[in-house]
Swiss-Prot record:
It catalyses: adenosine(1067) in 23S rRNA + S-adenosyl-L-methionine = 2'-O-methyladenosine(1067) in 23S rRNA + S-adenosyl-L-homocysteine + H(+). Keywords: Antibiotic resistance, Methyltransferase, S-adenosyl-L-methionine, Transferase. One of its GO terms (biological process) is response to antibiotic. It is an enzyme of class 2 (transferase). The gene is tsnR. Belongs to the class IV-like SAM-binding methyltransferase superfamily. RNA methyltransferase TsnR/AvirB family. S-adenosyl-L-methionine binds at residues 135, 165, 218, 238, 247. This is 23S rRNA (adenosine(1067)-2'-O)-methyltransferase. SUPFAM superfamilies: alpha/beta knot. Specifically methylates the adenosine-1067 in 23S ribosomal RNA. Confers resistance to antibiotic thiostrepton.
Amino acid sequence: MANLDVIVDRSDPAVQRIVDVTKHSRSVVRTVLIEDIEPLTQSIRAGVEFTEVYGLDTVPFPGDLLAACEKRGIRVRLLSAAVANQVFKTEKKPKVFGIAKVPPAGRFADLESLSGDVVLLDGVKIVGNIGAIVRTRSALGAAGIVLVDSGLGTIADRRLIRASRGYVFSLPIVLATRDEALAFFRDGGMRPVVFEADGKLSIGELDGIDERLVLVFGSEKTGPSGEFAGVATESVSIPMNPAAESLNVSVSAGIALHRRARRNLSRPRG
């Protein structure tokens, strides 16, 4: 294990960078704090540009993460216990974390260049659900995700990074208005299908559709908006126990993506 430099002085410029990035009142987000081993590792693999990665001098720095940083030329240092206590006064101290530049937002053009299905989440605001869908998409091969009325101002939201385990940077995620999304899918040559409790197609029939689909999901309470239901060529339902009120949206998306995995995983990613 390499001997890592330890930051012991509160006046080190890195300390102020860390303090600045943890402020909740920032109006313009250009940098983000990414914490924990898996989100850091996935972000590094996705090509996110890091200023520096840090650990605590009281905890061994993970060897695999150090190797990933060295491969990318990312500097790694440790915080002394005293400095860490000053920086994270009101927050739980992460054992490993990094300061990264926020990547550019995803664009509809990024989706056009890919071949897999697209997931559209309409009015889904629970970040944990969005993060779970991002992880499932990474495993099952859809091209990307469009978020409409999600309440998120950036894909670099720390809650989303944590919930997605860092996979949020591994695929195009487009933050769009409803009108922007409708215009793209009208002109983009993809077939929108909306998921509803009384959908006409069963989930099993998705496996036989050899076209690029837009899989449209709404919130559990209200479902997709009428605008998206109006442009969808088909509606799909997932059979379940009549005594159950609904499925969690991340579970529904996972079931749908599993049904589409044969097609999506067989297509080139680029």
